[in-house]
Amino acid sequence: MSFLRFVGAILFLVAIFGASNAQLSATFYDTTCPNVTSIVRGVMDQRQRTDARAGAKIIRLHFHDCFVNGCDGSILLDTDGTQTEKDAPANVGAGGFDIVDDIKTALENVCPGVVSCADILALASEIGVVLAKGPSWQVLFGRKDSLTANRSGANSDIPSPFETLAVMIPQFTNKGMDLTDLVALSGAHTFGRARCGTFEQRLFNFNGSGNPDLTVDATFLQTLQGICPQGGNNGNTFTNLDISTPNDFDNDYFTNLQSNQGLLQTDQELFSTSGSATIAIVNRYAGSQTQFFDDFVSSMIKLGNISPLTGTNGQIRTDCKRVN
């Protein structure tokens, strides 16, 4: 991690989160559940062997969770008569809930009532990235789980795949994140897949023009049109977010953007928005995987520390799908 980015991350944590964040600690479970990391790694490793998308699913849940009322596990709640974040359009197609349940069961068998669901998302995200050949970082613990969900917040705060860069930037700055964070965290699209419905508007009728998105590479466009034919029954059809190394966590996502082969509109906007400062960041990451990894780690630490519930706030759910 570069020195300036490290200092920036520390100052951000102190300024934004203050006393509540000070209660997060890498040693939080050292006495109450000392094997938490090995237990979570065991489940993630098993699931990753049968589902290459496991890590991508978990990190999406973590990101979407933290962007709505902070990192509090609210995205995991099932309905209890009110609408949940799971029901929000931004979370359509979200997966990995069963993986979280498996991790929670494994932890409850060893350390009942100790490890929060919010902390599970943070730790499993790091492990998922490492298992996909990405960087490692020290995860801080001590988050509590929320008692409620916020569907309206999910609708307003989570970037949709159809956003322009002008819309995305304030969504990030409102969470204390800058342009580097936006581009670095978007790099998580170096693994995982997306449904046709999240990008097919770019293939045939972009913004109601009757034509494809002109920023899509012509050969890539033909490939995608074959995967998601116009008027086809594409609801359950997925394709890779990274066409070159779809299961590896690397910097190919950024070289794809340079070739106009970003899958989602929000991806390609980072490179194709004329005059944007994000272009230089994309070029930097395309040229240096080390730089991408360093900044990604810094941004993930910032993400994981957005408005956590700590101390006497919240609870430790024994079942991540429902409050105790």
From Swiss-Prot:
Residue numbers bearing the Pyrrolidone carboxylic acid modification: 23
Keyword field: Calcium, Disulfide bond, Glycoprotein, Heme, Hydrogen peroxide, Iron, Metal-binding, Oxidoreductase, Peroxidase, Pyrrolidone carboxylic acid, Secreted, Signal
Positions of glycan attachment: 35, 150, 207
Sequence positions that bind heme b: 189
Cofactor note: Binds 2 calcium ions per subunit. Binds 1 heme b (iron(II)-protoporphyrin IX) group per subunit.
Catalyzed chemical reaction(s): 2 a phenolic donor + H2O2 = 2 a phenolic radical donor + 2 H2O
Disulfide bonds: 33-111, 66-71, 117-320, 196-228
GO biological process: hydrogen peroxide catabolic process; response to oxidative stress
Chain sites annotated for binding Ca(2+) 1: 65, 68, 70, 72, 74
GO molecular function, one term: metal ion binding
Site (Transition state stabilizer): 60
Signal peptide range in chain numbering: 1-22
GO CC entries: extracellular region
Residues the record lists as binding Ca(2+) 2: 190, 242, 245, 250
Gene3D superfamilies: 1.10.520.10, Peroxidase, domain 2
Alphabetical list of PROSITE patterns matching this protein: PEROXIDASE_1, PEROXIDASE_2, PEROXIDASE_4
Chain positions recorded as substrate binding sites: 159
EC number(s) from the headed UniProt entry: 1.11.1.7
Cofactor(s) of this protein: Ca(2+); heme b
Function: Removal of H(2)O(2), oxidation of toxic reductants, biosynthesis and degradation of lignin, suberization, auxin catabolism, response to environmental stresses such as wounding, pathogen attack and oxidative stress. These functions might be dependent on each isozyme/isoform in each plant tissue. Plays an integral role in secondary cell wall biosynthesis by the polymerization of cinnamyl alcohols into lignin and by forming rigid cross-links between cellulose, pectin, hydroxy-proline-rich glycoproteins, and lignin.
Family assignment from sequence similarity: Belongs to the peroxidase family. Classical plant (class III) peroxidase subfamily.
Protein name, per record: Lignin-forming anionic peroxidase
Lineage: Eukaryota, Viridiplantae, Streptophyta, Embryophyta, Tracheophyta
